[in-house]
Amino acid sequence: MAALPSLRQLSYLVTLSETLHFTEAARRSFVTQSTLSGGIMELERLLGGVLVERDRQNVRLTPLGEQVVARARVLLADAQDLMRLSREMSEPLTGDLHLGIIPTIAPFILTQLLDEVHKQLPKIQLHLHEAQSEKIVERLEHGNLDMVVLALPFDTRGLKVADIAKENLYLVCNKHDKHSVNAHSLDDLDLSRLMLLEEGHCLRDHALSACPIGERKNDNRLKASSLPTLVEMVSSNLGFTLLPEIAINTHMLKFNDDLLVKEIENAPSRTLALITRKSTPLQSEFDVILDILKRITATLH
């Protein structure tokens, strides 16, 4: 059998792809620069191609290098899962669990989720990571997260997906916005006044999928960095927005006397989902957390 690349060599290449700097990549890998350079050169020899182009100013991956990095990330994540499998067989439902959640879900479930995980998985140390969908899916693929909670539709790229709940988006407007107050469907709304989260939030994409606002989606006045900011903009009668059902009965809306919340026809929807790698050794934990999330969301819908 021909010699195969080692996981260490692949790890060196992945780290270099993240830093594009040999000294920094060596520091992160806890080796000398010459050791890291030698490992990558040996990897290039084994694969029979140039992976990295170097000059005095720049380090960049070749097209082959980019493809190898993408595959290396999967192999390294699978290797981590393999190591975890042994521990999981001997000590199930114990240890650290890193869970990613998007910002348009996290605030509404975290308190109950932490309580239920503490009750049902007392030997699990839960670490929560909040970030936008693309970032947490990328971290899941790279093995930095064990599972993530996000909203579909979203490109899950061959990962294992389990639906939690489906929910509609509701119209939220200022009570003095007569046009929106009297609307019965999306067709009745003045979409030039639709307020959205900034790019990167999947809730923005879900709203836009049903609201063809054209070039106005590039208008900075339509963007908010967070749901509380978006609600404040609507409360000031700068426009209306569409919010998920999970947010409707929270203090963010319930105690704001300026706002009206109503269900409308043809409203877009989203599906909350729990996602992990197909190679995960944490299937038991996945099943428990999925059940917890289903019960939590059932109380919020």
From Swiss-Prot:
Coiled coil: none annotated. One of its GO terms (molecular function) is DNA binding. It holds the Pfam family LysR_substrate. CDD domains: PBP2_OxyR (cd08411). Keywords: DNA-binding, Transcription, Transcription regulation. Residues 22-41 bind DNA. Residues 5-62 form the HTH lysR-type domain. The keyword DNA-binding applies. GO terms for cellular component: protein-DNA complex. Transcriptional regulator of the esterase operon. PANTHER family: TRANSCRIPTIONAL DUAL REGULATOR HCAR-RELATED (PTHR30346), TRANSCRIPTIONAL REGULATOR OF OXIDATIVE STRESS OXYR (PTHR30346:SF10). Belongs to the LysR transcriptional regulatory family. This is HTH-type transcriptional regulator EstR. It comes from Acinetobacter baylyi (strain ATCC 33305 / BD413 / ADP1). The lineage of its organism: Bacteria, Pseudomonadati, Pseudomonadota, Gammaproteobacteria, Moraxellales.
